Amino acid sequence: MKLPIYFDYSATTPVDKRVAEKMMQYMTNDGHFGNPASRSHKFGWQAEEAVDIARNQIAELINADPREIVFTSGATESNNLAIKGAANFYNKKGKHIITCKTEHKAVLDTCRELERQGFEVTYLDPEENGLIDLNKLNDAMRDDTILVSIMQVNNEIGVIQDISEIGEMCRARKIVFHVDAAQSAGKINIDMQALKVDLMSISAHKMYGPKGIGALYVSRKPRIRLEAQTHGGGHERGMRSGTLATHQIVGMGEACRLAKEEMAQDQAHVTAMRDRLWAGLNSMEQVFINGDADKRYPGNLNVSFNFVEGESLIMALKDLAVSSGSACTSASLEPSYVLRALGLNDEMAHSSIRFSFGRFTTTEEIDYAIELIKGAIGHLRDMSPLWEMFKDGIDLDSIEWAAH
């Protein structure tokens, strides 16, 4: 067993060796390195064929038409293109957008930018379990609402939103519905023929593909129009100009093919890993799961350890690659905005750790982690006067702290 142990699959996944081998065939002089847009010679035709195959593999993963797949540099760009592109195209109908406070920053910051441009955004509060109350969403919808953007699986707490029902609500009101599926594509079953979703963002590096490549699903029936955010050679049906990165696209296609083939065993594996870790951690006092216990992706376990300071806990667990909050905001010492939105106080939000598992996690690693965490928690709590008071039965909320 190698240290440190990687428990941060929600931040990124290692590229599957089978994916890397496929990518290598499209980079060097002895491979198919041509530009897919070069229509006048064999090098271009070979690259174009590889892109077409990958486009089909991505479409098959989510049961979509390959013509509905637009390549981007990743889910952040897909989110920007979907939200800004739809808002700019449909702004004659209205300027109201609805999203949720626990969305990824790539959605929230994009909405903030649109607010600066004169759009109005409603940020829904989630319930304590991290899920959206659909009645509150319905109440927020107005005649001038043009777009709803809700993620499928939350990157920090792993809860799964009911995008099927939200899609029905949006379609009934003729509102464009965008879903950030960065954390769900390739991990849970997605059927675009059954879902009333207009736009969906997908990332390769969350499902054992390369970084720097993603896709945006853009519905053809009903036809969704976007205003391009990148201008140039008119690639991707004018929606996203730029030379297609054949090797990365091939990698994403292969990652999607493997994800579809191995989804059942991947799900069973991460569920077993999650259950084993939780069984070990749950034997301690004052340990809580954040987010709904049932409606969640099994590869994510977000846990708060009461009476322990989060920074010191992460330092004590230096042999475990875990995170507090998302990778995109983990550099800040602010408590997670997602956990705060759930109603956790600063102390509980600060003492939370996100464990995320994947294809290469082993039971040996889980067992090592359990013992390490138990030891670290015990040591840190022994130093905590609050823990001592709690053990003595003192209600900490009743204490009046002296101001210094």
Swiss-Prot record:
Cellular localisation: Cytoplasm
One GO cellular component term: L-cysteine desulfurase complex
Catalytic residues, chain numbering: 328 (cysteine persulfide intermediate)
Cofactor(s) required for function per UniProt: pyridoxal 5'-phosphate
Residue positions where N6-(pyridoxal phosphate)lysine is found in the record: 206
SUPFAM superfamilies according to UniProt: PLP-dependent transferases
InterPro entries per UniProt: Aminotrans_V_dom, Aminotrans_V_PyrdxlP_BS, Cys_deSase_IscS, Cysteine_dSase, PyrdxlP-dep_Trfase, PyrdxlP-dep_Trfase_major, PyrdxlP-dep_Trfase_small
GO terms, biological process: [2Fe-2S] cluster assembly
Gene3D superfamilies documented for this protein: Aspartate Aminotransferase, domain 1, Type I PLP-dependent aspartate aminotransferase-like (Major domain)
Keyword line: 2Fe-2S, Cytoplasm, Iron, Iron-sulfur, Metal-binding, Pyridoxal phosphate, Transferase
Catalyses which reaction(s): (sulfur carrier)-H + L-cysteine = (sulfur carrier)-SH + L-alanine
Residues binding pyridoxal 5'-phosphate, per UniProt: 75-76, 155, 183, 203-205, 243
Pathway where this protein functions: Cofactor biosynthesis; iron-sulfur cluster biosynthesis
Binding site for [2Fe-2S] cluster: 328
Enzyme class name: transferase
Entry's EC annotation: 2.8.1.7
GO molecular function, one term: 2 iron, 2 sulfur cluster binding
A matching Pfam family: Aminotran_5
PANTHER family according to UniProt: CYSTEINE DESULFURASE, CYSTEINE DESULFURYLASE FAMILY MEMBER
Oligomeric form and interacting partners: Homodimer. Forms a heterotetramer with IscU, interacts with other sulfur acceptors.
Function, in words: Master enzyme that delivers sulfur to a number of partners involved in Fe-S cluster assembly, tRNA modification or cofactor biosynthesis. Catalyzes the removal of elemental sulfur atoms from cysteine to produce alanine. Functions as a sulfur delivery protein for Fe-S cluster synthesis onto IscU, an Fe-S scaffold assembly protein, as well as other S acceptor proteins.
Family according to the record: Belongs to the class-V pyridoxal-phosphate-dependent aminotransferase family. NifS/IscS subfamily.
Protein name in the entry: Cysteine desulfurase IscS
Lineage: Bacteria, Pseudomonadati, Pseudomonadota, Gammaproteobacteria, Alteromonadales
Gene name for this UniProt entry: iscS
